[in-house]
From Swiss-Prot:
<dbReference type="Pfam" id="PF00163">
    <property type="entry name" value="Ribosomal_S4"/>
</dbReference>
<dbReference type="InterPro" id="IPR002942">
    <property type="entry name" value="S4_RNA-bd"/>
</dbReference>
<keyword id="KW-0687">Ribonucleoprotein</keyword>
<comment type="similarity">
    <text>Belongs to the universal ribosomal protein uS4 family.</text>
</comment>
<dbReference type="InterPro" id="IPR022801">
    <property type="entry name" value="Ribosomal_uS4"/>
</dbReference>
<dbReference type="GO" id="GO:0003735">
    <property type="term" value="F:structural constituent of ribosome"/>
</dbReference>
<dbReference type="GO" id="GO:0019843">
    <property type="term" value="F:rRNA binding"/>
</dbReference>
<keyword id="KW-0699">rRNA-binding</keyword>
<dbReference type="GO" id="GO:0006412">
    <property type="term" value="P:translation"/>
</dbReference>
<feature type="domain" description="S4 RNA-binding">
    <location>
        <begin position="118"/>
        <end position="178"/>
    </location>
</feature>
<dbReference type="InterPro" id="IPR018079">
    <property type="entry name" value="Ribosomal_uS4_CS"/>
</dbReference>
<dbReference type="InterPro" id="IPR005709">
    <property type="entry name" value="Ribosomal_uS4_bac-type"/>
</dbReference>
<dbReference type="Pfam" id="PF01479">
    <property type="entry name" value="S4"/>
</dbReference>
<dbReference type="GO" id="GO:0015935">
    <property type="term" value="C:small ribosomal subunit"/>
</dbReference>
<comment type="function">
    <text>With S5 and S12 plays an important role in translational accuracy.</text>
</comment>
<dbReference type="GO" id="GO:0042274">
    <property type="term" value="P:ribosomal small subunit biogenesis"/>
</dbReference>
<comment type="function">
    <text>One of the primary rRNA binding proteins, it binds directly to 16S rRNA where it nucleates assembly of the body of the 30S subunit.</text>
</comment>
Length: 205
């Protein structure tokens, strides 16, 4: 296993949840945090600890987004009208790397970020290599013609681990999809419970 893969799995162990619902998660072997003190019994978490865990889960799920960038999503969610928790989820689900993952063009959010970084993705016919690019309703996202035969793409599209959510319309034969509508929290197929309301509470302290 590569160091990169190990670091991804450490996120699962540190948080004590199988964030992406994958069969290879280390939690299938041991359900304690990494490190020599990982098996110590934990006391009852404080409200702050619960809020922090909710934030770390959401950050980790989307490829361990940096704290600076994640806080910007929170601030933008607060500025927008409507429910702040729903706004936060919408912004995260509009990230181009998240869309690539949801459309099953990559097996993990980490692979999706790398895929976008390397210029394999087109949005409305133009190459976009910024993982945090926000996709809009009606945008067409597709894999570049030269990249359609990459093993990682073929493995992802043929994987039975996940289904494409209803807010995305995807043709895997053409490796192209459309962002049909902005999702609500209840629409997003998280393998574990996400609590954006606790994330909002964390930043509102």
């Amino acid at each position: 296993m590569t160091k990169r893969a190990e670091s991804k799995f450490k996120i699962n162990r540190r948080l004590g949840v199988n964030l992406w619902g994958r069969a290879k998660s280390p939690l299938n072997k041991r359900d304690y945090a990494p490190g020599q003190h990982g098996q110590r019994r934990k006391g009852k978490p404080s409200d702050f600890g619960i809020q922090l865990m909710a934030k770390q889960k959401l950050k980790g799920y989307y490829g361990n987004i940096s704290e600076k960038q994640f806080r910007k999503y929170y601030e933008e969610a607060v500025r927008r009208k409507g429910d702040t928790s729903e706004n936060l989820i919408e912004l995260l689900e509009r990230r181009l790397d998240a869309v690539i993952y949801r459309m099953k063009f990559a097996l993990t959010p980490f692979a999706a970020r790398q895929f976008v970084n390397h210029g394999h993705v087109l949005v409305n016919g133009k190459r976009v290599n910024i993982p945090s690019y926000l996709v809009k309703v009606g945008d067409v996202v597709e894999v570049r013609e030269k990249s359609k035969q990459l093993a990682m793409v073929l493995d992802a599209t043929q994987s039975g681990e996940r289904d494409v959510p209803e807010y995305l319309h995807v043709d895997h034969r053409l490796m192209k999809g459309t962002y049909a509508r902005y999702p609500k929290l209840s629409d997003v197929p998280y393998p574990v419970q996400m609590e954006p309301n606790l994330v909002i509470e964390y930043y509102s302290r």
